[in-house]
Amino acid sequence: MPKKRRSRRRPQPIIRWVSLTLTLLALCRPIQTWRCSLSLGNQQWMTAYNQEAKFSISIDQILEAHNQSPFCAKSPRYTLDSVNGYPKIYWPPPQGRRRFGARAMVTYDCEPRCPYVGADRFDCPHWDNASQADQGSFYVNHQILFLHLKQCHGIFTLTWEIWGYDPLITFSLHKIPDPPQPDFPQLNSDWVPSVRSWALLLNQTARAFPDCAICWEPSPPWAPEILVYNKTISSSGPGLALPDAQIFWVNTSSFNTTQGWHHPSQRLLFNVSQGNALLLPPISLVNLSTASSAPPTRVRRSPVAALTLGLALSVGLTGINVAVSALSHQRLTSLIHVLEQDQQRLITAINQTHYNLLNVASVVAQNRRGLDWLYIRLGFQSLCPTINEPCCFLRIQNDSIIRLGDLQPLSQRVSTDWQWPWNWDLGLTAWVRETIHSVLSLFLLALFLLFLAPCLIKCLTSRLLKLLRQAPHFPEISLTPKPDSDYQALLPSAPEIYSHLSPVKPDYINLRPCP
């Protein structure tokens, strides 16, 4: 009797233990996304002179906020080094100049939606449409830029260029959330130096950005080639907010104009083509929710809720596993039934062929006997001696045919159930055995969750909190020029020139407004 061979199907660990992975993922806190928006609105008065004025967003208050903010601890400290109240200001590198003086952004790890680098304001949906002023016209223009940032802990630099002579600037700085915008008083910088306007603007920063800490990022200052002119602009015109050009500029030969830009002085204010030019340092916005310096608070998690969720997922996956196993068992049983039918047909055909072969052998033996009897009656010997040939007989082997009758049914030789590691049968049906196996697997999974899941959850949460508490680190860049650098100090030695910075209100009474 041959030994029965029982096939074993290996368990599928993905189906058995995937509930543990889902449980741990469900217990992890998702990292919240955060977005800040910057809005710059400026209002200017246009006169007969179509001039280009460049304004930017940096002043002494940003130094104070930087030095006092605990979120800028890893950045270098600054001192308010100014002359007659005018602090250090910088100019960013140009990034694609377009018509009307619109300048794009200089971005690092922040991702602004608009304006695009190299695009002018009419190509960007976040710019308000504005028409160029006609000669001799007088009107008020309002521009708003909405700057959407995906990562507010990065660095961004913005240059805002407008047209006009000695413009009246009104700025607002706010987030753009779904709820109503922050309510703070509108700034009014009527005919005051532009630098003081930025001071008023930055005083509102704390209210405008309730979720942001503003840090001033050190960056090498650059000036575009447009500032390198060897000419004189008279100050006897309708009144400039800045002194004459030759006071601030040195000889053109002092600069290497082949590169298109140079290092300006740290305290330099420019008068460009009868326009006002201020310089802009990079500004960084730090998310207060992720850069908080306060000690982390311990949050107690409910292990009962976590285990309940894990057990619920395990029960659901176990039910799926039982259903899949039952369906597989049914299909395997159907296959075995079909194979048994085919096996029975083959055995019947082989037995019939063997029976026919036995009949042929019987007929051959009968013919031999008849021929031998005929030869003997005629006086001869039997057939074989008469024809002088050896006699042959047909012998049929029946051993292999007999073994076919000893075969057990296929359903008794092939197991449709997974018996490992519980190799028992107990006369139970397949459904009962599969259910018992699933319940035992669920019990082992519950024990695993009870002993190891709390430890894993604690490790994951502590790691996430550690990552969230890490404040962004900004590189410390020295603002002091090297001795061998071509850093050009353009300020004159006499500080009395700043007395000319006091603005003069132009006489626009005789000007007629635009129809």
UniProtKB/Swiss-Prot annotation:
<feature type="glycosylation site" description="N-linked (GlcNAc...) asparagine; by host">
    <location>
        <position position="287"/>
    </location>
</feature>
<keyword id="KW-0325">Glycoprotein</keyword>
<comment type="subunit">
    <text>The mature envelope protein (Env) consists of a trimer of SU-TM heterodimers attached by a labile interchain disulfide bond.</text>
</comment>
<keyword id="KW-0732">Signal</keyword>
<dbReference type="GO" id="GO:0016020">
    <property type="term" value="C:membrane"/>
</dbReference>
<feature type="disulfide bond">
    <location>
        <begin position="212"/>
        <end position="215"/>
    </location>
</feature>
<dbReference type="GO" id="GO:0046718">
    <property type="term" value="P:symbiont entry into host cell"/>
</dbReference>
<feature type="glycosylation site" description="N-linked (GlcNAc...) asparagine; by host">
    <location>
        <position position="256"/>
    </location>
</feature>
<feature type="coiled-coil region">
    <location>
        <begin position="388"/>
        <end position="420"/>
    </location>
</feature>
<dbReference type="GO" id="GO:0019031">
    <property type="term" value="C:viral envelope"/>
</dbReference>
<feature type="glycosylation site" description="N-linked (GlcNAc...) asparagine; by host">
    <location>
        <position position="271"/>
    </location>
</feature>
<feature type="glycosylation site" description="N-linked (GlcNAc...) asparagine; by host">
    <location>
        <position position="351"/>
    </location>
</feature>
<feature type="disulfide bond">
    <location>
        <begin position="384"/>
        <end position="391"/>
    </location>
</feature>
<feature type="glycosylation site" description="N-linked (GlcNAc...) asparagine; by host">
    <location>
        <position position="398"/>
    </location>
</feature>
<keyword id="KW-0564">Palmitate</keyword>
<feature type="topological domain" description="Cytoplasmic">
    <location>
        <begin position="457"/>
        <end position="515"/>
    </location>
</feature>
<keyword id="KW-1133">Transmembrane helix</keyword>
<dbReference type="InterPro" id="IPR018154">
    <property type="entry name" value="TLV/ENV_coat_polyprotein"/>
</dbReference>
<keyword id="KW-1161">Viral attachment to host cell</keyword>
<dbReference type="GO" id="GO:0055036">
    <property type="term" value="C:virion membrane"/>
</dbReference>
<feature type="short sequence motif" description="CX6CC">
    <location>
        <begin position="384"/>
        <end position="392"/>
    </location>
</feature>
<keyword id="KW-1160">Virus entry into host cell</keyword>
<feature type="glycosylation site" description="N-linked (GlcNAc...) asparagine; by host">
    <location>
        <position position="230"/>
    </location>
</feature>
<comment type="function">
    <text>The surface protein (SU) attaches the virus to the host cell by binding to its receptor. This interaction triggers the refolding of the transmembrane protein (TM) and is thought to activate its fusogenic potential by unmasking its fusion peptide. Fusion occurs at the host cell plasma membrane.</text>
</comment>
<keyword id="KW-0261">Viral envelope protein</keyword>
<feature type="glycosylation site" description="N-linked (GlcNAc...) asparagine; by host">
    <location>
        <position position="203"/>
    </location>
</feature>
<keyword id="KW-1168">Fusion of virus membrane with host membrane</keyword>
<feature type="disulfide bond" description="Interchain (between SU and TM chains, or C-215 with C-392); in linked form">
    <location>
        <begin position="212"/>
        <end position="392"/>
    </location>
</feature>
<keyword id="KW-1043">Host membrane</keyword>
<feature type="coiled-coil region">
    <location>
        <begin position="330"/>
        <end position="376"/>
    </location>
</feature>
<keyword id="KW-0472">Membrane</keyword>
<keyword id="KW-0812">Transmembrane</keyword>
<dbReference type="GO" id="GO:0020002">
    <property type="term" value="C:host cell plasma membrane"/>
</dbReference>
<feature type="short sequence motif" description="CXXC">
    <location>
        <begin position="212"/>
        <end position="215"/>
    </location>
</feature>
<keyword id="KW-0165">Cleavage on pair of basic residues</keyword>
<dbReference type="GO" id="GO:0019062">
    <property type="term" value="P:virion attachment to host cell"/>
</dbReference>
<dbReference type="GO" id="GO:0019064">
    <property type="term" value="P:fusion of virus membrane with host plasma membrane"/>
</dbReference>
<feature type="site" description="Cleavage; by host">
    <location>
        <begin position="301"/>
        <end position="302"/>
    </location>
</feature>
<feature type="region of interest" description="Fusion peptide">
    <location>
        <begin position="304"/>
        <end position="324"/>
    </location>
</feature>
<feature type="transmembrane region" description="Helical">
    <location>
        <begin position="436"/>
        <end position="456"/>
    </location>
</feature>
<comment type="function">
    <text>The transmembrane protein (TM) acts as a class I viral fusion protein. Under the current model, the protein has at least 3 conformational states: pre-fusion native state, pre-hairpin intermediate state, and post-fusion hairpin state. During viral and target cell membrane fusion, the coiled coil regions (heptad repeats) assume a trimer-of-hairpins structure, positioning the fusion peptide in close proximity to the C-terminal region of the ectodomain. The formation of this structure appears to drive apposition and subsequent fusion of viral and target cell membranes.</text>
</comment>
<keyword id="KW-0946">Virion</keyword>
